[in-house]
């Protein structure tokens, strides 16, 4: 006992007691920066791009991937490099250590901020907007025929449809399956809940959730410090940060003003803050503006950018070469 050994009595007693385990399975869908880790996985495990693997409408992606394959050592690293036995590397089983620029503290703050902003403010506002509308969660400008067309496209893209199709089910049988109520667990912002609804209604339900993306980058060296591709990787694996496509909107304006500065304009130069009509591709185009503040005045370009004024942006665009803006 003095040497730290158990007596026979103690050994028998402890052996008879049940083991208390605190076992946790490590899942790639859990933890910090899930979307970033998945993006990095796909990037490092990418294979040499083959044109035949890309649909005709996505040739831009093929060209970009081809450039990455030739110029970026990290792109496809696992397939470009070989182990001593000649095999390619496995990101999961070969003991690789991958160092990134992600700041764990900033990442945690970013995930919390995105979640709070969407759940507390944006989603409730969107829910109020679509409440009671037949076309919900889509715009009221769409006809029901257009809404149903969008939903059916989503139906054909889901796993249930593929499984039924591969099993030989007819379109009528598939349609009946999607309109039959079934037990399922669905996502909520407060955890999964069990419910009963048709698979078609579940698609519409998931379409009502707002998607979001967030990325924080160091302006000095381009290092990514925080990366949020969505709110829940398990239910919304599509990465809105890198894969999501959207109109740039007013975020394009600083680039327009940068081009203007390169072409001799100054932040102090004056421009007419009035609505004007321009000829675009032989047709008249009249930009609108959300505010009429200082309408009719001569305002500085600095003020125009601060106010995100569409009329000043259109005025600048008329004075510059559109192609130069595209290639900026």
Regions found by a protein language model. Give the residues of each.
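Mid-domain, small-residue-enriched loop/turn segments at the edges of structured enzyme/sensor domains
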Residues: 284-289, 321-328
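Metal-dependent DNA phosphodiester-chemistry modules and their immediately adjacent helices/loops
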Residues: 293-321
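Short glycine-/small-residue-rich flexible loop motifs, especially phosphate/cofactor-binding loops
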Residues: 257, 314, 323-327
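Extended, non-catalytic substrate-recognition/exosite surfaces adjacent to catalytic cores, especially
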Residues: 1-283, 288-290, 302-303, 315
């Amino acid at each position: 006992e003095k040497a730290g050994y158990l007596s026979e009595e103690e050994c028998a007693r402890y052996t008879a007691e049940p083991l208390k385990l605190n076992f946790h399975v490590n899942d790639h869908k859990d933890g910090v920066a899930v979307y970033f880790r998945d993006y990095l996985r796909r990037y490092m495990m990418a294979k040499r791009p083959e044109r035949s693997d890309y649909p005709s409408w996505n040739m831009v992606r093929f060209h970009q991937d081809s450039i990455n394959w030739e110029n970026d050592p990290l792109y496809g690293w696992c397939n470009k490099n070989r182990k001593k036995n000649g095999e390619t590397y496995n990101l999961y089983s070969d003991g690789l250590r991958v160092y990134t620029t992600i700041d764990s503290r900033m990442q945690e703050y970013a995930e919390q901020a995105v979640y709070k902003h969407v759940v507390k403010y944006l989603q409730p506002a969107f829910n109020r907007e679509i409440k009671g509308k037949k076309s919900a969660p889509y715009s009221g400008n769409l006809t029901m025929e257009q809404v149903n067309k969008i939903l059916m496209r989503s139906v054909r893209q889901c796993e249930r449809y593929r499984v039924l199709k591969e099993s030989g089910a007819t379109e009528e049988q598939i349609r009946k399956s999607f309109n039959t109520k079934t037990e399922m667990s669905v996502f909520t912002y407060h955890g999964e809940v069990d419910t009963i609804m048709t698979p078609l209604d579940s698609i519409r339900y998931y379409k009502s959730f707002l998607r979001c993306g967030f990325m924080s980058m160091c302006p000095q060296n381009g290092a990514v410090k925080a990366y949020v591709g969505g709110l829940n990787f398990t239910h919304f694996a599509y990465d809105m940060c890198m894969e999501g496509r959207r109109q740039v909107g007013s975020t394009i304006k600083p680039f327009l003003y940068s081009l203007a500065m390169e072409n001799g304009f100054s932040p102090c130069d004056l421009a007419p803050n009035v609505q004007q009509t321009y000829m675009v591709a032989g047709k008249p185009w009249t930009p609108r503006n959300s505010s009429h503040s200082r309408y009719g005045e001569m305002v500085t370009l600095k003020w125009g950018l601060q106010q995100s004024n569409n009329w000043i942006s259109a005025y600048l665009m008329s004075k510059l070469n559109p192609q130069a803006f595209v290639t900026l």
